[in-house]
Amino acid sequence: MKVAVLGAAGGIGQALALLLKTQLPAGSHLSLYDIAPVTPGVAVDLSHIPTAVEIKGFAGEDPTPALVGADVVLISAGVARKPGMDRSDLFNINAGIVRNLIEKVAATCPTALVGIITNPVNTTVAIAAEVMKKAGVYDKNRLFGITTLDVIRSETFIAELKSLNVADVKVNVIGGHSGVTILPLLSQVEGVTFTDEEVASLTTRIQNAGTEVVEAKAGGGSATLSMGQAACRFGLSLVRGLQGEANIVECAYVDGGSEHAEFFAQPVLLGKNGIEKVLPYGEVSAFEANARDSMLDTLKGDIKLGVDFVK
């Protein structure tokens, strides 16, 4: 099993690489790429950790050597948010970065499972899909926008609010991966009830949690460590699915035939072909149905931006 991380010298990439080095199955290969010259050194640093995961780093303009034979590609390359920016402000820089990297993925490892972390995810996933369509290698079951950070934040904040063991909290987060498009389905959380006020404040906190971190870091970065953990969880789930493990379910932003939008985050069953099945997200409350319906124009606009960028 070979996993490639593109953008591996950045804050998310280094955290993700560390977690993968310690958690990938024995015998796996971990390939790190970044434009930054430090990247081979990051791999050397991580290579001193005593796990049976072989690691190699690549720097420079061309990610191709890092991508050869990759089963899973996780893309975190791009610029991070600063105070006062929202995820869409990143579009102008990150759109081109994702397009260029996906062109190389399409040419080098077209059947790999690809997880996009680079923001704005609502748009960058659409860009990736269009690039792969142009290259004639698009498989909607192999492309994912990683929204796991919204899920782990929801789990954490619910457990804190209700004094629960966080390991017991399961929640679906649907929609997209920015602001109002992030919709945690709190009505489905088992064994707990929320007041209307709690639902409203918790939903808003989950939607704005990225900004909470950006502001707390006072210009020194965005959510890199928690995103690294979220991306590792999702990446390991992709690997487990590829290895034939049963019942691996994660929420992800996918081209899953949703009635709501061309791309939509919802639970998916993972397997040897990536998405084995897009799962229904279940019954929702009136609050959630309203929030879902009112986000769709924003989400569709984000998607159109990505499609138009490639065309």
Curated annotation (Swiss-Prot):
Record-annotated active site: 177
Catalytic activity, EC: 1.1.1.37
Sites where the protein binds NAD(+): 7-13, 34, 94, 117-119, 227
GO BP terms in the entry: malate metabolic process; tricarboxylic acid cycle
UniProt GO MF annotations: L-malate dehydrogenase (NAD+) activity
Disulfide bridge positions per record: none
Catalytic activity from the UniProt record: (S)-malate + NAD(+) = oxaloacetate + NADH + H(+)
Residue ranges the record marks as coiled coil: none
A cellular-component GO term for this protein: cytoplasm
Function recorded in the entry: Catalyzes the reversible oxidation of malate to oxaloacetate.
Similarity-based family: Belongs to the LDH/MDH superfamily. MDH type 1 family.
Assembly information from the UniProt record: Homodimer.
Name of the protein described by the UniProt record: Malate dehydrogenase
Source species of the chain: Shewanella baltica (strain OS195)
